[in-house]
Amino acid sequence: MKNNYTSLKSPLDEEDELKTDHEIDLEKGLLPEYNSEEEGALPPYSDISKLAKTVPEDSSTGPTETANPNVERRQGFKDSHPNIYSLLRLLISVLAVSVVFFTAWVCVNPLEKSIFGKVAFSVTIGITCPILFIAIFCFFETWTQAVAQCIKVTAIFLAQCVKACGKGIKHFLKKWENMPMAFSEVFLFNILVGSPRMNLRYIFGDRWGLKCSLAEHITFVVLSILVFIAETVKPGSIRVNLIRKMGYEAKQQVNEYTAVPLREMNPESEA
């Protein structure tokens, strides 16, 4: 049976195919194997694959930026309700100026001052309040964003503090068996330190300014709490440190009193 197949290609076409089969594109490298069974697969280096991979970009708009939802919400409210937004700015500005004015009035009380004091107060308030009103009204969006950012940072900081305190309390509660001893030590601390403190306050209170002092009570309460926490977490830490400190100071005093001068030990050194 004879093969009647006749090639329709000219000898020049066959020669070009042989050349292109053996030539390698230095930029693209070797051609990868093409698997026609894969869905959506395209021949390598084909124009169709280039068109499929190309993503159209809008040169007029440029890259899109991630907008802040709070800014968009504020801008939308400003565009939809311009009168209410302006009234809100005016109300907040007047409220802030009023707070500053009445605070300064209560603190300074210009009615009890001399004429010079009244004039100085009037000039200061007359300059400060308009400047404050203009700054708050004109830069309303700027300082509101700054205040919101400060509130956000403060909230994050407080959340971290609460988390750290929770871990500390959890570790503290693990030492619950030390709490009765720590409480008794705090009670003893209040007896030993509280009685002399009360006597000194009643005797020398007018001279030292210790009578009915709020700072004194707060300091004493804080010290008691610190003693309770330290003795609960590490029992005996305060007692050991206090005894060591007292022993070290007593040893230094003994060394100072019993030290023999160098001249008395070596009288020949004077000659």
From Swiss-Prot:
Q: Which family does it belong to?
A: Belongs to the WTF family.
> A GO BP term, please?
meiotic drive
Q: Where is the composition biased (Polar residues)?
A: 57-69
Provide the topology term for how it sits in the membrane: Multi-pass membrane protein
Q: State the protein's name.
A: Meiotic drive suppressor wtf35
Its keywords, alphabetically, are: Membrane, Transmembrane, Transmembrane helix, Vacuole
Gene behind this chain?
Answer: wtf35
According to the UniProt entry, where is the signal peptide?
none
| Region feature (Disordered) | 1-24, 54-75
Q: Which organism is it from?
A: Schizosaccharomyces kambucha (Fission yeast)
